[in-house]
Regions:
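Glycine- and other small-residue-rich loops at beta-strand/loop junctions that grip anionic moieties
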Residues: 24, 94, 136
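Conserved beta-alpha
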Residues: 101-104, 108, 112-165
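Short active-site-adjacent helix-start/loop capping segments
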Residues: 55-58, 93-96, 124
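N-terminal glycine-rich anion-binding loop in soluble enzyme alpha/beta folds
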Residues: 1-71, 141-144, 148-165
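Alpha-helix C-cap/termination motif
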Residues: 38-41, 79, 108, 127-128
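A general structural motif
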Residues: 17, 43, 82, 111, ...
Length: 165
């Protein structure tokens, strides 16, 4: 039996793709699919961990996630650097506070860029000079009130804003 063998030298990428961590709610059934659809064809690697959230959706229950953020973030590629962490909870970010969410995430992953849906939305409103928005949410009135107050405070400081809820 004659076996021919060829050596092929592997060609590895010198740089790895940027690593994106996604903090998803334990009750969110679509975020991974949605996130992958948005990031389709981008040269990045996505790593997900879930954070426990409680029903019913109230500001008090949203605030309970604050204490979990650091430990859940640490479990995304433990000991490894991650370029970006996306905390996928608009209402939780608003209830807890963008700066507090960022602080907790960066305790677990120092130097990473932190984003949330509301952070990205506000950046987009500013970049596109949006002057009028409509907000449609699945939230109860008490949470909607918190969101509308936040948007009015965050955006109207920069320019005149009409908020339709």
């Amino acid at each position: 039996m004659n076996i021919k063998s060829n050596y092929i030298k592997p060609k590895f990428k010198k740089e790895s793709n940027p690593k994106v961590g996604l903090l998803a709610l334990s009750t969110d059934l679509t975020i991974e699919k949605d996130f992958n659809s948005i990031c389709y064809k981008l040269p990045l690697d996505i790593f997900v961990n879930r954070i426990h959230n409680e029903n019913p959706l109230t500001k008090e229950n949203l605030l309970k996630m604050y204490e979990q953020i650091e430990s859940i973030t640490e479990k995304i590629l433990p000991g490894e650097k991650i370029n970006t962490i996306a905390y996928a909870c608009t209402s939780g970010t608003i209830a807890i506070g963008e700066d507090q969410v960022k602080e907790k995430i960066q305790l677990a992953k120092p130097g990473c860029y932190v984003t949330t849906p509301i952070t990205s939305a506000i950046k987009a409103f500013n970049k596109m000079n949006i002057k009028k928005i409509a907000v449609f949410t699945p939230y109860p009135e008490s949470v909607n009130k918190t969101i509308s107050e936040y948007l009015i405070k965050k955006i109207s400081m920069q320019r005149h804003l009409v908020l339709l809820i």
